[in-house]
Curated annotation (Swiss-Prot):
Phylogenetic placement of the source organism: Eukaryota, Viridiplantae, Streptophyta, Embryophyta, Tracheophyta
SUPFAM superfamilies attached to this UniProt entry: F-box domain, Mannose-binding lectins
Iron-sulfur keyword on record: no
PROSITE patterns assigned to the protein according to its UniProt record, in alphabetical order: FBOX, JACALIN_LECTIN
The protein's name in its UniProt record: Jacalin-related lectin 38
Length: 521
């Protein structure tokens, strides 16, 4: 006789789910209303936050992507993220901050808040002008979190700051005496327990220290001295990060001689208030091999320290001497470096990110809901359509640009085996990565006064057999490949403009193909 089903106690159910990998939990949100509600509770995602290995978020002009590092191998996986930023144009200044599992994007058109893991972005307009976007935190004296944004700029004698609640357009301005320090050594903040922290430099004492900002008291404060070995050398690489969720870690990299890396961590949990009693301990030292392309840059490296039963592993994301994005992994006497080939641009920005299930907060403004033209919610990847046929191979995405400039393709007796595209951003010609393996190619140039409107072709169950590119002015290219299988057409309505490509390539064929497009401006 079958026994009746009994629900597990709510707390026990939550405890079991919190020990599952976050990759699975993200898919479980749609199983039932009960679990979806559970995942939104702060007690749940606070307990789950430390279970996921950190990732890196990279921001280039053409796209935003996340990099997941597999330490067994090692290897990396690159995933494209929503990057439809309202009003964004090429080379427009954009500041990026990270707080409490959420990313902040700030441009002159407004401010966005994003959870890359849940693929959620919300935007609101703001009259945010004249200040550097300095970070997001909250008043930790209140029980509920109300996120606030800090903007600031320095003069010779004062630090001018402006604070607003997330979603509001009312900024309150403050002025602080300037005591021979600045935040120029730290292009981004570190948020912990609602407060903001930066690596700062005192020009009089020539010391590096942590500068803090407390949203509950609206005040800047000298928090604690940093354990630098070469305090007088401003050109060394220095980076502040979170360790074990409640402590600081500090990376220092020598620019001369050995380029050695030292990692320091705070001995105890970081608490709000006075930090003069903070103690630092040296966690690990890394000897960078002479053959490594790792270099010291003005933009500090993003990193995290992984702990397991075997030992400590330092994982760094930064760009190398040539400006190419790399992942560097140091464990014991082994040192690895992996190029992030999905990014074709140089010197991308990067941040460490802890995957989580924290929901992007909704906004209110002056007691009313923000209207549709003030905020947008985006839960989907980049605009694009695709034909996906065969299996196997490596997924790739060139991103999106102003226009497509040149197409390089190679075929054999069965179909398309190689593609490579050149793009244009402003007056800059950008080379996409090569997809496939070939030495013999055919090309198509796109005139400066024209653009690709659609891609037509054929495919079988295993691969793309042919492609032709339709230009807006009515000229169709020669067909590449062999007309065999089912037909496809990729593109938007008449007048839409293709601005990038993505797909999947195996050692033998092009097995999937897609386009990014936008309406004609």
């Amino acid at each position: 006789m079958m026994q009746p089903d009994h629900d597990l106690p709510y707390d026990l159910e939550g405890e079991i789910l919190s020990h599952l990998p976050i990759q699975i939990l993200a898919r479980f949100r749609c199983v039932c209303k009960r679990w979806n509600t559970l995942f939104k509770e702060r007690r749940f995602f606070n307990s789950d936050l430390g279970l996921a290995r950190p990732q890196f978020i990279l921001l280039a002009e053409s796209k935003i992507c996340s990099v997941d590092v597999n330490l067994d191998g090692p290897s990396i996986e690159v995933h494209n993220l929503p990057s439809d930023i309202p009003g964004y144009k090429l080379y427009m200044p954009m500041h990026v901050e990270y707080c409490d599992g959420l990313f902040l994007y700030a441009t002159c058109y407004g401010i966005g808040i994003c959870n890359p893991w849940l693929r959620q972005i919300r935007w609101f307009k703001s009259s945010y002008e004249g200040y550097d976007f300095s970070g997001m935190g909250y008043d930790n004296s209140r029980q509920d979190k109300h996120y606030k944004i800090l903007g600031s700029y320095c003069t010779n004698t004062t630090m001018n700051a402006s604070v607003t609640e997330l979603g509001s357009d009312a900024w309150k301005s403050y002025e602080f005496a300037f005591h021979s320090w600045n935040l120029s050594m730290s292009p981004y903040s570190v948020s912990l327990n609602g407060n903001l922290y930066w690596v700062a430099y005192n020009h009089e004492s020539r010391d590096y220290f942590i500068q803090s900002f407390d949203f509950s008291t609206v005040s800047f404060k000298h928090y604690c001295i940093l354990p630098t070995k070469n305090g007088h050398r401003q050109c060394d690489g220095r980076s502040l990060a979170i360790f074990r969720e409640d402590r600081f870690s500090f990376l220092e990299q020598e620019i001369y001689n050995t380029r050695n890396i030292e990692i320091w961590v705070t001995k105890e949990t970081i608490k709000n208030g006075d930090g003069e009693a903070v103690e630092w301990v040296n966690l690990m030292s890394v000897l960078v091999p002479e053959w490594s392309s790792l270099s010291v840059n003005y933009y500090p490296p993003s990193y995290f320290v992984d702990e397991d039963k075997v030992g400590l592993t330092l994982v760094i994301c930064c760009y190398n001497k040539e400006g190419k994005a790399y992942i560097y992994i140091a464990k014991g006497d082994k040192f690895h470096e992996i190029e992030i080939k999905d990014l074709v641009e140089y010197n991308p920005r990067h941040r460490t990110y802890f995957p989580n299930l924290i929901q992007v907060p909704t906004f209110t403004m002056s007691g009313r809901s923000i209207t549709q033209h003030q905020v947008e919610s985006r839960f989907a990847p980049l605009r694009g359509i695709q034909v996906s046929v065969g299996v196997g191979g490596d997924e790739w995405d060139d991103g999106f640009f102003d226009n497509v400039k040149e197409i390089i393709i190679h075929t054999n007796s069965l179909g398309i085996i190689f593609v490579k595209f050149y793009y244009r951003n402003g007056n800059v010609r950008v080379a996409g990565a090569a997809h496939g393996d070939s030495t013999e190619t055919r090309g198509l140039m796109v005139p400066d006064d024209d653009y690709i409107e659609a891609v037509q072709g054929t495919y079988t169950e295993s691969h793309i057999t042919s492609m032709a590119f339709r230009l807006h002015k009515g000229n169709r290219s020669l067909r590449f490949g062999f007309f065999e299988g089912m037909s496809f057409v990729l593109g938007g309505a008449r007048g839409s403009k293709i601005i990038g490509f993505y797909g999947r390539s195996s050692d033998l064929y092009l097995t999937a193909f897609g386009v990014h497009f936008s309406p004609l401006p």
